[in-house]
Amino acid sequence: MKKSFIFSTSAATLATLALIGCQAVQEKVSPDSLLATFTSTAPNLAAGASDPVWAKASPLSAALTGGANFGAKPGEKGESTVTLKAAYTADMLYMLIQYKDPTNSVRRGPYQKQADGSWKKLKDPADKGGDDNVYYEDKWAMLWPTNEATAKQFDKEGCAMSCHEGQTKPYGNKYTNQPGQLLDMWHMKGQRTGPLGFVDDQYTDDTRHDPKTAPNAGRKGDPGPAGGEYTGVNLVNGKPQFMARDAKAANAGGTYYIKKGDEVAFDDSKFKTGDEVASIIINPLAGTDRGDVRTANSYANGMHTSVVSRKLVTGSKFDVQFADMSKRYGFGFAAFDNAQVRHATSDEPMYLVFGKK
């Protein structure tokens, strides 16, 4: 079912930029289009929204609806708004992504020490498989058609073309409808990829769901490190096998992830009842197809901010290639508030277009 949404650009911003002669605002684009402004100086990802490049870029905003935990109470569905800006250099695309979220969710499936000294992995009691909405992380995702066969249907249906409800999972399964259709997926995972500065570069093809051979249906990762973006920490003799080198509890100044190479043998004596520790070791994606998209993330005043970069042309068959500056490139956006799959989304397609140099 299509959800209602609103696209908007800031009239005040357009007027201001027109006065200073910004090339981008002299170019007319449709209300559903995000105009990438050419810049000779790349934005500093770590500077967030304050980098001067973003003051010259026109925003595009879209309403996101139907996402778990975005409502007034935990678990309730609600809405958010995402605001996007884009810029490009001779060989790179940059995007500023900001959306409202009242909570910064970081407690992704931690182990917690119990009163009797045992360790328990915290999990949503209502989760029947792949649907945790209590102990998870904040995420966002973008989908990009990679070829004309995919774009033709995406133009009509947006992200909904790949969402198939009523197929064993609360939010269905994700796959394209025809052989040859391929969606490039940028999947920013707040605790698994974001801390190392990566967006998980994935894709969606026409693989149907099979509980044994294709539990994720058509959603797959680009070629990357062995084990994927993270490795789970197991319980050994009732205790987590590893802990972070600093031996801090995650809920007392530590983190809910362990960076690869920072794991050490677990020392139970370092923790007291109620302490929580990470259940994941996160792997760097650098130097792999899966690590093509970089990000710098921050959270403040109820707002997530990501500054993203990717080569215009990666050469990967799993990626959208921004090779033709005269084309428009369809995309969709979804935000996840402490939810594994129950995302808030704008189902109608948006389009990235490139301004003149």
Model-derived segments and spans:
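C-terminal motif of bacterial Sec signal peptides marking the signal peptidase cleavage site
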Residues: 18-21
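Bacterial N-terminal signal peptides that target proteins for export
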Residues: 1-10
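Beta-strand-rich interaction surfaces with strong enrichment in secreted/lumenal proteins
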Residues: 72-73, 82-85, 293-299
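Extended, compositionally biased non-globular segments
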Residues: 257-322
